[in-house]
Amino acid sequence: MSKIVKVIGREIIDSRGNPTVEAEVHLEGGFVGLAAAPSGASTGSREALELRDGDKSRFLGKGVLKAVAAVNGPIAQAVIGKDAKDQANIDKIMIDLDGTENKSQFGANAILAVSLAAAKAAAASKGMPLYEHIAELNGTPGKFSMPLPMMNIINGGEHADNNVDIQEFMIQPVGAKTLKEAVRIGSEVFHHLAKVLKAKGLNTAVGDEGGYAPNLGSNAEALAVIAEAVKAAGYELGKDITLAMDCAASEFYKDGKYVLAGEGNKAFTSEEFTHFLEDLTKQYPIVSIEDGLDESDWAGFKYQTEVLGDKIQLVGDDLFVTNTKILKEGIEKGVANSILIKFNQIGSLTETLAAIKMAKDAGYTAVISHRSGETEDATIADLAVGTAAGQIKTGSMSRSDRVAKYNQLIRIEEALGDRAPFNGLKEVKGQ
């Protein structure tokens, strides 16, 4: 038995300089797992609760000492002596002990950190890499693939201090034959984009996820400068590289309308905004749009799915918040055709795996994702490979908190070789 003998929680700092929870899980035999919870900026209202202290005298109220105390106290007491290899049981113990619908007693940040640390410790005790252990937990032992990255090279919305409404403009290096080649192509386009922006006298400072955050004349201009950079890098848009966007539309949804500051404060209805996006897909090879409407606008999402769902991937992030109850409703109503997977929206590895399985069983794709507040923890790389999810969103080609995930994927690809195919555009719904 891989018995848990010690659990340690601590407050560490994330990529935005805010505190987050790190957990260590120690097993018999000296095996240790270490994991940290990420944190979002544009968050869905139905996400599991991230517990913050609210004490304005520390970290402007963002301390996580209460969550850390939960790890070191009741959570540790409950899981010590239990088998770390039984992930479902470890997670159930913590969820039941918390006793709330949204993990607000201990905080999803506390429960998730322990959940992931336990998985890492269990993998170590089995003498296998984390991705291999995750594949076993997923009921798909030995089944791996390398994910197609969505690289967020222009940041707007809540991730940047600029006038661009749409939160993420991403490139997907679909012409690559391997993950490593995809990273190289992404890096080359990223550097050419800096040159394009500089030549236009635009800012090349980066946002939370490592993409550039220039002030632009419109949202379409972001796509235009990316197209220029792709060409300058020697690649063909639509063949070597496709585009993806995260609208994070809840952030500019006001009084039932979608108000775009970057389009001269123009207000759109749900239908009008869907057609605004449809027009962009006709001008550029956009194959994936995330949160194209507000999380509460289910009628609008149904319409958007009818208009665009057979042509492109429509990803629900704030819409589904990695929650199987909400995803089930979406599947039944024919809303979206893909789910974004974020550990900390739901708060445990077991529930995350359940959401991925439900999506795949329904013919939806699952896109594994970072948060805008990250750490050096690269667990999502192992999750993407170990569930053969097929797609990953982990930022741009700068900032160590983003690059850590790409580097881990490069290592995993090297270790697995032909056992983990890179399927490129075939992974994207509708392509």
Swiss-Prot record:
CDD domains: enolase. GO terms for molecular function: magnesium ion binding; phosphopyruvate hydratase activity. Coiled coil: none annotated. Its cofactor is Mg(2+). Keywords: Cytoplasm, Glycolysis, Lyase, Magnesium, Metal-binding, Secreted. Belongs to the enolase family. This is Enolase.
